[in-house]
Amino acid sequence: MLVLQRIPKRALQFNGVTGTVCSTRLFHHAFNLNLQQSFVPSEERRYRNSNRGFTRGSDSNSNNKYRNSSYDDNRSRSNYGGDKRNNRNNNNYGNNRNNGSRRRYQDENSDIEVFKSKSFNVTTLNPESFHEQVTIDSLLEESLLDANVHKAISAMKFESLTPVQQRTIKPILTTENDVVAKAKTGTGKTLAFLAPLFQHLISTKLQNPLAVKAVIVTPTRDLAIQIASEVKKLQQCNPSLKSYRSLTLIGGTNLDKSLKDLHTLNPNIIVGTPGRINDILDRVGAKYFKDVDFKVLDEADTLLQIGFQTELSLISRKLNEFNTQGEEHIRTLLFSATMDHNVQELAATIMNKKDCLFIDTVDKNDSEAHDSIDQKLVITKSFAESMVALIQSIESELLQKKNFKAILFLPTVKFVDFFSETLSESLTKRIDIIKFHGKIDQKKRTKLVDRFKKTNHGIFVCTDVGARGMHFPSVEHVYQLCVPTSLPNYIHRIGRTARAGESGAATIFLFREELKFVDELRRDTNVVIKNQEDYLNQDKENFDMISSIITNNPDFPEALKSIIGFYKGVQNEYRLNYKVAQNVLRSFSELHSDSSMLLRFRPSEINNFFSNRDMRFVSDLIDVKNPHSFGKDREFDDEDRYTSRSQNNYKSKQSSKSNRFEGRNDYSNSRRSHANQKRNFTFDD
């Protein structure tokens, strides 16, 4: 049971630092969604290049402010690699199953207040409500779809509309309501809103033909570019639609050029990311965005997970204020693969109409994953085995097939860089390996996406920046190493295969201490990985060869550290404990085939990876040295960064626990004088 509340737009006040939500009246309208409610944490997100900070949208009492970060690895980088304000005493492995980043999925009958204030009528259309077979021909016959739109869609040679398109296009065309739609990933959501938008442009072509009439907001630049390409495809299929122009506004591109294009092109459709759209609205919103009729939020759950709630509220408020037909004129279309509390709360904030249509295209007994995906879990004893097993699995596929197209998801940017090289050196059959993450500049990212779309023989190695909304044709297999950042991300990752009616496979490699993730996945998303197998190291020679390639890569130590930082960031998501860190650290020795080989840390970075309490369990598994004690032979450069050398040289096999921590007291004393350090370095509670 969902209790709806609505927040009036006038009550939203933003002072550039925090977002305060006020309400004078309360209205409850309950209806049965038959859905599990999930809480997905809003993660840190850079909003423009300024010192502007926002409190977390999902927690009005939080005093934590967003630090600058990128979309990739937002969870891991918030805990890895540098910010000393990481509240490390609150980040112990497995201290509290309910604390930290994860809030438990809510029972479907819980009384959650989502919308506040004035009357807000919600009509729910569950899957059982749909009996009519909707086609583009039937829409044309009912005069709901213009012949030009019909011609464009027909030329794209779709055999039929997908269930999502059948259930959403007609309600959007026949009502003036706001629409919230839940649909599995890879089911054709883009056309579900593009078709009605083009129909609207045709219907209103005599009314302000040079005005922006639709704004589409996406979580990532790459998804915005992809949607813009879908717009162009429709126009290419019917050139008469080319009179309706579109413009992509995304970060990583020249702002002045965006402003110039907005002035010269007079676009009718804007596709962009929240940060850049907000920048444009601040500068020229009153001039160019006064006639907007639609705003569309694609992948709404991703927008919130990244931490865009405040920006989305700002966009909605500005568009309403600029609109010449009143603040309640703009229709909202919100599409999401998951429908949790945060998505509902966002909808409450940004919807304008008194009537909302909630369209659920997923049966309550279905899993949230696509049915045509063959899911597999490979269980290993260690992270070392997981890495080797992954490479061996890909090698096996390559040997069996002439062409092979796959996506590999990894947790961090550093590990993507490292593992891409390792994979290239390990595979005996040549294949195009494309690494992709948010640290790559936008121009190159666009080229990489196009390259992978066109190839039929390649592996796309990426972070979660490639998990949401991206459509790559004919992807046969999706691989995952380590748990995903959140449960919904698992759904979106595997959704990169088995798209547009095709079948596909998805394999995740987990060591035993990670298996709590599987239980959480089954309980909260109804996704059951039936095909599970234990990894058996039957070819020791091959295992040793791959291990050697891994350890000979000079970036391996830092890449492995980033994995430890990643697990620290997701420990509360799946209630992981210190044993995960132990396993990863032991993998360093296992891959070297030498129990005395320990992963080295500088004293100054220990707090970024381990809490004081965790040090009880991992102190015997790490090597901590004072960089100032190395003299001429020290392995730290002048900027105090770790530089990799032959691992055989940096530690004596006979070293004891005491000499691994040599100099720690001197270093601790020196840190007392550091102006920005709040507490001394110590290994004790």
UniProtKB/Swiss-Prot annotation:
Keywords: ATP-binding, Helicase, Hydrolase, Mitochondrion, mRNA processing, mRNA splicing, Nucleotide-binding, RNA-binding, Transit peptide, Translation regulation. Residues 42-107, 633-685 are annotated as: Disordered. It is an enzyme of class 3 (hydrolase). The keyword RNA-binding applies. Coiled coil: none annotated. It catalyses: ATP + H2O = ADP + phosphate + H(+). Residues 70-86 have a biased composition (Basic and acidic residues). ATP binds at residues 183-190. Its EC number is 3.6.4.13. Its main location: mitochondrion. It is found in: Mitochondrion matrix. Residues 170-357 form the Helicase ATP-binding domain. Pfam families: DEAD, Helicase_C. SMART domains: DEXDc, HELICc. The Q motif is unique to and characteristic of the DEAD box family of RNA helicases and controls ATP binding and hydrolysis. Belongs to the DEAD box helicase family. DDX18/HAS1 subfamily. This is ATP-dependent RNA helicase MSS116, mitochondrial. It comes from Kluyveromyces lactis (strain ATCC 8585 / CBS 2359 / DSM 70799 / NBRC 1267 / NRRL Y-1140 / WM37) (Yeast). The gene is MSS116.
